[in-house]
């Protein structure tokens, strides 16, 4: 085979160079005696050189060192998430899975379901809004005009569909937790609360007002912690002249009423 020099160069940079860089990263981690992190990086085929270099991704993987993801499908899911999400969003998803599972253990919930919902909760977050809208309309997921107008809101509903169709998730409890993780709803289950709350307090979250107070409350009461979290969301949204979805407003009112009646 007569290959030109340019062909060889292109093959090197397209095929061999990424492998070499990835191998270098693994070797570097081993040299730094971060054996656990090296194993974590190698255990997920979808984590390429760029992701392995990302500090947030490394931090998220470090959370999973002592207790890896339990679902046997997790490596495949992680590979799909790595390919479809931005690095920060990917790291956030791993961190929410860790946090959801932890809170589930604390509050006597199903840790596997919590992990699954936490891992997949943002699986549609990086889709373009017009694609989210197309999926929502084509599959009759919602006719709420306020949801349809905002990717920040719509990705949860579409994410539940994507989790079922693309990731093979069939558990209705998990799919429901994904559907409502960003708005909540009156009467939501404790698993729903666990995932919704974990989304806002996972370890990689940048500091915001009352974050540490919410984290502390989450150790003893999902309801009180979620109420404080949603009230903070309401303050943040309204202070910027933006729209707070009625479902969130109703969830806040429901939590206040429930906590008052429980006294």
What do the predicted segments below correspond to?
Residues 25-28:
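Short, positively charged and aromatic/hydrophobic N-terminal segments
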Residues 239-263:
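Charged phosphate-binding loop/patch that engages nucleotide di/tri-phosphates or the phosphate backbone
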Residues 79-84, 92, 101, 105-228:
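Divalent metal-dependent catalytic cores for phosphoryl transfer on phosphate-bearing substrates
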């Amino acid at each position: 085979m007569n290959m030109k020099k340019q062909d060889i160069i292109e093959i090197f940079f397209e095929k061999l160079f990424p492998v070499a860089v990835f191998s270098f990263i693994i070797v570097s981690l081993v040299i730094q005696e971060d054996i656990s992190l090296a194993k974590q990086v190698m255990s997920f085929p979808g984590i390429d050189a760029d992701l392995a270099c990302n500090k947030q991704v490394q931090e998220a993987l470090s959370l999973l060192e002592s207790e890896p993801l339990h679902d046997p499908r997790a490596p495949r899911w992680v590979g799909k998430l790595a390919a479809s999400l931005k690095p920060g969003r990917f790291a956030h998803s791993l961190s929410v899975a860790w946090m959801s599972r932890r809170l589930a253990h604390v509050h006597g919930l199903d840790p596997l379901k919590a992990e699954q919902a936490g891992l997949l909760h943002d699986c549609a977050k990086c889709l373009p809004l017009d694609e989210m809208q197309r999926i929502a309309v084509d599959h009759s997921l919602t006719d709420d005009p306020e949801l349809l107008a905002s990717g920040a809101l719509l990705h949860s509903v579409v994410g539940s569909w994507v989790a079922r169709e693309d990731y093979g998730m069939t558990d209705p409890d998990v799919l429901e937790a994904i559907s409502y993780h960003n708005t909540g709803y009156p009467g939501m289950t404790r698993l729903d609360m666990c995932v919704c709350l974990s989304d806002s307090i996972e370890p990689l979250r940048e500091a915001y007002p009352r974050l540490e107070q919410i984290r502390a409350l989450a150790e003893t009461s999902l309801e009180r912690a979620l109420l404080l979290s949603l009230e903070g969301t309401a303050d943040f949204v309204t202070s910027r002249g933006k729209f707070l979805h009625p479902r969130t407003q109703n969830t806040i009112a429901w939590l206040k009423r429930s906590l008052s009646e429980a006294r």
